[in-house]
Amino acid sequence: ARNKREGCTRCLDLCPTGAITPGIGPLKDQVLISAEICAGCGACAAVCPTGAATYALPPTQALLRRLRRLLLTYAEAGGAAPVVLFHDETHGEALIEALARHGDGLPARVLPLRVNEVSSLDLAVFAGAFAWGAAAVRLLAPAKRGHGVDGVLRNIDYAEAVLAGLGLAGPAPRAALLETDDPFSLGEALAALPRMAFGFAPARFEALGSPREMAQQGFRALREAASARVVVVALPEKAPFGLARVEQSGCTLCLACTSVCPTSAFTANPDQPELRFLEDSCVQCGLCAATCPEKVITLEPRLNFAPEAAAPQVVKAEEPAACPRCNKLFGTKASIARVKAKLSAHWMFADPARQALLDLCEDCRVLEATNGGIDPYAGAARPVTKTTEDYLREAERAKRGES
């Protein structure tokens, strides 16, 4: 960030070729993607919580439309417990063709869907697949794991955590990565999958909105259909959803968090000292916690299905501080008390008259300092210089037992 605090580094941490670098100079609050170095794995798009990095081959919304039509058509034709198999062209398609030519082919309920890179699948794809009726999702990858799959493995963990929290976990993982170069091993793994149907009708919502909005909509549809009415589901670290918890007793309403939040999850009330938080917009980047001067913000990755998560909630509100001279409203009482406590040990504010200046607004403070004869450049009072006679006099008094 521009304040030299570190926030979200998901794409920087996962890029296998180092194509993503933090900006410098005028671009220091951005990240730079070098098209010449990028290998096209899509790991950055898979984990980006804001949609700043997206994969265009195909776009997520186009992929979700294909996925929705595939699953709903299968359900309308009488199919049950479908398994979606995502694969690429170079490795996956050849493996499926070999299985069809030399073996029994894919099981009837396995629906293959080709993508450019399986490592580019973001969380919205998993949420949409399960909401639209998929009983399981499998990603086909080479046996020798590539460097770009760490991002999609995170999304698999997040999807599994949500399903487990909603009581929808199956006897086998519903989302997993199949790493094999053997077509017969692929066929055996898919045939061995148990039929893990959810037991409720697939959702019918359209694939509209950003990937983040689609992920939230998909998980909400699953929660509405699930028998367990869970409100909050805990998620692993670095999940794209969560709460930024503020310790109210230590918050001074300085509003530093509102100026750095990239998604406006933290906002201020322009009419009075008030801090608001919108949980659905929080991407757990950590900039607020790193910037908070009081260190009272902590991150809690979770998925909150309560209606309050979709509306700004008041985190803390205080009465504004009024200038005792002109009654102008400025700052908050807590922030002024905090400043006075920090400056109480400073020599410039040892005098109570100096401390009283902090209770005034910016205009009255200048007038009081000018009319009161306060010299802002005056140093602390110098101690009286002690001479040799002073030391000898003290020694004589000590001999006589005088204090």
Residue spans for each PLM region:
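Short strand-loop junctions, especially beta-strand C-caps/beta-turns
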Residues: 115-116, 142-143, 249, 280
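Flanking helices and flexible, charged tails adjoining ferredoxin-like Fe-S electron-transfer domains
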Residues: 1-7, 36-133, 140, 294-403
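Ferredoxin-type iron-sulfur electron-transfer modules and their immediate structural context
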Residues: 1-14, 18, 81-94, 149-151, ...
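Beta-propeller domains
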Residues: 6-12, 17-41, 50-51
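Accessory beta->alpha helical hairpin/"wing" motif in late/C-terminal subdomains of nucleic-acid enzymes
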Residues: 32-33, 276-278
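Short tyrosine-centred short linear motifs in exposed loops/low-complexity segments
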Residues: 42, 255, 285-286
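Cofactor-cradling patches in redox/metallo enzymes
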Residues: 125-182
